[in-house]
UniProtKB/Swiss-Prot annotation:
UniProt-listed InterPro entries: RNaseH-like_sf, YqgF, YqgF/RNaseH-like_dom, YqgF/RNaseH-like_dom_sf
EC number of this enzyme: 3.1.-.-
Name by which UniProt lists this protein: Putative pre-16S rRNA nuclease
Annotated Gene Ontology cellular component terms: cytoplasm
Record keywords, A-Z: Cytoplasm, Hydrolase, Nuclease, Ribosome biogenesis
Matching PANTHER family: POLYNUCLEOTIDYL TRANSFERASE, RIBONUCLEASE H-LIKE SUPERFAMILY PROTEIN
Entry keyword Nuclease: yes
Protein location: Cytoplasm
Tree of life domain: Bacteria
Length: 138
C-alpha cells in the first residue's frame, strides 16, 4: 500500500506527518519552512509511494474558515497543479495545537522542549493524520 501525507500548514513553518504503508499509524516526519514545502513534497513523493495528501482545515469555533485559509487555498491549488494524480482532502484541525501540547506534557518533555514550535507543528500534523486514518476505519 501507499502512504498518506498530512500537512499542518503554517505561514512560516509546516508540520508534516506520514502514515505507515498499512495506513494504520501516523508518524511525525518533520517540519519544513513553508516556502520550501512544495519542493519537499516533490522529493518525498519521488522516494515513497503516496496515495493522497491530507491538509489541516483551519476552522473557528463557529465553523467558519479561519484567517489562515486564505494562505492554504493558493498552496492547495499549487499542490494539485504539481501533483494532479494525488487526491487532496481536508481534515478539521481545531484543537490540534492544544492536543499537541498536551501530548508533549504527558510524554514528560521539559518546558524548553514544549516551547519548540516546529515540534508542535509536527505533532499537530500527526494528530490530523491519525484523526483521518481512524475516520476511515469505521
Amino acid at each position: 500500500m501507499s502512504r498518506i501525507v498530512a500537512i499542518d500548514y503554517g505561514r512560516k513553518r509546516t508540520g508534516i506527518a506520514v502514515s505507515d504503508t498499512l495506513q494504520l499509524i501516523a508518524n511525525g516526519l518533520t517540519t519544513v519552512p513553508t516556502h520550501e514545502l512544495l519542493n519537499f513534497i516533490g522529493g518525498y513523493v519521488a522516494k515513497e509511494p503516496v496515495e493522497r495528501i491530507i491538509i489541516g482545515l483551519p476552522k473557528q469555533m463557529n465553523n467558519e474558515a479561519s484567517e489562515n485559509m486564505k494562505n492554504i487555498e493558493p498552496f492547495v491549488r499549487s499542490l494539485k497543479k504539481r501533483f494532479p494524480e494525488l487526491p487532496v482532502e481536508y481534515v478539521d484541525e481545531r484543537f490540534t495545537s492544544v492536543l499537541a501540547h498536551r501530548t508533549m506534557l504527558e510524554a514528560g518533555l521539559k518546558k524548553k522542549d514544549r516551547q519548540n514550535k516546529a515540534l508542535v507543528d509536527e505533532i499537530s500534523a500527526t494528530i490530523i493524520l491519525q484523526t483521518y486514518l481512524e475516520s476511515k476505519r469505521f
